[in-house]
């Protein structure tokens, strides 16, 4: 066996040789050990030395007694580094899209997966309301929970729109999303399986700068 800190170096070497390695990390929390070589070399290699180092990182999140560092999603660790794209597919077609996108490009792809999504066979569509009370922007596994929350809120007479977040980085705040947020009564909430002080806060801040509403965050 090898240490987690060594595996990142192996895949970086493979990426530099054009192998396009798929790196499976069993628990996202272990990215604290697996990520240093990737984010400090592979992610920067293309921009600094004009030598791409494409790596497809399958980073798997899980819940339930996994320990203080092993559980939940940790995609925020990769967000601040240039040259890294972050995507969080939760459906079969989304995952197929993620892989095909990676094969067309030469960037580092951090694929934030979640074990709970593996049994899912259905696609997830956005839900729009005219003048909603609130707009939910769920990421990762919170997308399924957002659907359940929407149904419960509707029973209470609260209209909640849902705009599913597939791409984390680059984040594109589309005009349709902006109109939906601006037409809401109370603003939006970014839901994430990671800590609030990371991807969720960054996306919420971006939305507030480009809209007229407040956007809150919840780390679930």
Task: Describe each region flagged by the PLM.
Residues 2-6, 12-137, 143-145, 160, ...:
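Conserved thiamine diphosphate
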Residues 4-7, 50, 114-220:
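Thiamine diphosphate
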């Amino acid at each position: 066996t090898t240490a987690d800190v060594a595996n990142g170096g192996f895949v970086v070497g493979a990426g530099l040789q054009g192998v396009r390695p798929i790196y499976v990390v069993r628990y996202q929390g272990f990215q604290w050990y697996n990520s240093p070589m990737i984010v400090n070399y592979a992610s920067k290699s293309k921009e600094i030395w004009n030598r791409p180092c494409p790596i497809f990182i399958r980073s798997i999140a899980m819940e339930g007694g996994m320990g203080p560092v092993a559980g939940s999603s940790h995609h925020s660790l990769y967000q601040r580094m240039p040259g890294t794209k972050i995507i969080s597919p939760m459906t079969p077609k989304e995952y197929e899209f993620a892989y095909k996108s990676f094969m067309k490009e030469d960037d580092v792809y951090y694929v934030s997966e979640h074990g709970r999504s593996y049994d899912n066979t259905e696609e997830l569509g956005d839900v729009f309301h005219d003048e909603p009370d609130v707009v939910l922007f769920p990421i990762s596994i919170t997308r399924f929970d957002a659907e359940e929350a929407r149904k419960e809120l509707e029973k209470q007479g609260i209209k909640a729109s849902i705009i599913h977040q597939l791409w984390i980085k680059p984040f594109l705040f589309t005009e349709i999303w902006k109109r939906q947020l601006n037409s809401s009564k109370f603003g939006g909430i970014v839901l994430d399986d990671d800590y609030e002080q990371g991807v969720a806060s960054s996306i919420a801040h971006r939305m507030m700068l480009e809209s007229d509403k407040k956007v809150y965050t919840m780390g679930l």
